[in-house]
Amino acid sequence: MAGTWLLLLLALGCPALPTGVGGTPFPSLAPPIMLLVDGKQQMVVVCLVLDVAPPGLDSPIWFSAGNGSALDAFTYGPSPATDGTWTNLAHLSLPSEELASWEPLVCHTGPGAEGHSRSTQPMHLSGEASTARTCPQEPLRGTPGGALWLGVLRLLLFKLLLFDLLLTCSCLCDPAGPLPSPATTTRLRALGSHRLHPATETGGREATSSPRPQPRDRRWGDTPPGRKPGSPVWGEGSYLSSYPTCPAQAWCSRSALRAPSSSLGAFFAGDLPPPLQAGAA
């Protein structure tokens, strides 16, 4: 897994490396990167060698500092390439405090340190340290225009959610719907008054509407409207004859024939006409 990551890093940093079948190895150094290891920053330098010897043959890779000392590196490979050649990879970790003592850094490859070898161009680590990429704690960078569009989108979404919330609350607070219009209210009132005072036809003519009920504080001497003393009870224009239906007249006649047996009955009988006389009938 680490070898694949390092190969990808080298492909991005050194896209112009020569490829193809050849008998001479070609080393190259990738741009260094900064890593945080155990709370300390270290610089990692990767060396990629193309066209190395096949497995079984000695093809070491090592680093050398400006003072002539050799530095051992961790080597991956060799691994086969797509064009039939072999590739080798090595990386070196250096403390960030000791970079000045190790520059310039050179990568070597070949049959050995005593024989003929191939080397890279010297790399100055102090200058590379300022431009090296830092993997951990790298701040995210974006254009101000992108941040502005993101803020506008968030504001629109917030307003949409707020409008939906207000609409839902208004529907829950008024489940009966809107009030009827004034014209509808007037028609309903007219229809209600018509039902309270219906007009029926009796004997081929329209009956008059019943009068308003009189208060019950009248005494025995009071006479209902439309009736004179000594006139027949069921005469034309009397109080009881104004009721349009026959059941009401029958109920009144039956109630009039019974005498009140108690004070409560006398109180309710005060609103009824006196008993029907035989001569008046």
From Swiss-Prot:
<comment type="subunit">
    <text>Heterodimer with TCRB; disulfide linked. This heterodimer assembles with CD3 proteins into a signaling-competent pre-T-cell receptor complex. Interacts with RHBDD1.</text>
</comment>
<feature type="topological domain" description="Extracellular">
    <location>
        <begin position="24"/>
        <end position="146"/>
    </location>
</feature>
<feature type="disulfide bond">
    <location>
        <begin position="47"/>
        <end position="107"/>
    </location>
</feature>
<keyword id="KW-0675">Receptor</keyword>
<keyword id="KW-1133">Transmembrane helix</keyword>
<dbReference type="InterPro" id="IPR013783">
    <property type="entry name" value="Ig-like_fold"/>
</dbReference>
<feature type="region of interest" description="Disordered">
    <location>
        <begin position="196"/>
        <end position="233"/>
    </location>
</feature>
<protein>
    <recommendedName>
        <fullName>Pre T-cell antigen receptor alpha</fullName>
    </recommendedName>
</protein>
<feature type="transmembrane region" description="Helical">
    <location>
        <begin position="147"/>
        <end position="167"/>
    </location>
</feature>
<keyword id="KW-0812">Transmembrane</keyword>
<keyword id="KW-1003">Cell membrane</keyword>
<dbReference type="GO" id="GO:0046632">
    <property type="term" value="P:alpha-beta T cell differentiation"/>
</dbReference>
<keyword id="KW-1015">Disulfide bond</keyword>
<keyword id="KW-0732">Signal</keyword>
<feature type="signal peptide">
    <location>
        <begin position="1"/>
        <end position="23"/>
    </location>
</feature>
<feature type="topological domain" description="Cytoplasmic">
    <location>
        <begin position="168"/>
        <end position="281"/>
    </location>
</feature>
<keyword id="KW-0325">Glycoprotein</keyword>
<dbReference type="InterPro" id="IPR027834">
    <property type="entry name" value="PTCRA"/>
</dbReference>
<dbReference type="GO" id="GO:0005886">
    <property type="term" value="C:plasma membrane"/>
</dbReference>
<dbReference type="InterPro" id="IPR036179">
    <property type="entry name" value="Ig-like_dom_sf"/>
</dbReference>
<feature type="glycosylation site" description="N-linked (GlcNAc...) asparagine">
    <location>
        <position position="67"/>
    </location>
</feature>
<keyword id="KW-0472">Membrane</keyword>
<comment type="function">
    <text>Component of the pre-T-cell receptor complex (composed of PTCRA, TCRB and the CD3 complex) that has a crucial role in early T-cell development, particularly alpha-beta T cell differentiation.</text>
</comment>
<dbReference type="Pfam" id="PF15028">
    <property type="entry name" value="PTCRA"/>
</dbReference>
<dbReference type="GO" id="GO:0070244">
    <property type="term" value="P:negative regulation of thymocyte apoptotic process"/>
</dbReference>
